[in-house]
């Protein structure tokens, strides 16, 4: 009889786990999906388009960075439309490629790339870069959450600038549930290693899940090692962990910072980051 009492919870747990994993499709390697105002491309590891147009507008580059919480709140599209109105580049985390989101991209004339971290109920999830122009190249990166076993994603991309340079942009959603910082460091180093031989301007931004002093120290050290400095926001309403540490950041080099603010929004569980840069030349 005792065996039966023990078996029932185990069978229920096994059934629940099987049901959980039946929902998700995880690519065997990082995949990048191109998203245009007219179509969605087939998954690739990297994308190349050397003849892309320039990203900035007469030397000005406006940036929106936002974890949009899988578009779970009813007013996401209204807020995203308003916040993206004067931006040249959107770096979004926790973006689900729902029919409503595809329609929003189409209606507003955005183009871009999404890292296909996983698929659930037929909808791709992962970070996404949106602009009015395509990058000259972009690659997807993923890192498994060690406990949940679902990947977090990132995009490494390059965009043409009007001064003849290329801008490297890293859009990152960092691993969250880890014991220690090993997986966190692995994810950062894989992306930052791509920057070590690049001498031009760089933006690294996203949801870094920097909820501990150890993570913050590692983040600061790694970004400083490639010559990046952190954007300071005013007002600074960035979403914080219970200990007051901010989760979202923007780092840069080779650009002039003109303005940075983190307003309050109820359209996500994260507040958006708005940054204005100007080219140095």
Swiss-Prot record:
Keyword Cytoplasm carried by entry: yes
Matches recorded under SUPFAM superfamilies: DNase I-like
Gene Ontology CC: cytoplasm
Compartment(s) of residence: Cytoplasm
Alphabetical list of Pfam families matching this protein: Exo_endo_phos
GO molecular function: catalytic activity
Annotated signal peptide: none
Keywords in alphabetical order: Cytoplasm
HAMAP family: UPF0294
Family statement drawn from the similarity comment of this UniProt entry: Belongs to the UPF0294 family.
UniProt protein name: UPF0294 protein VC_2238
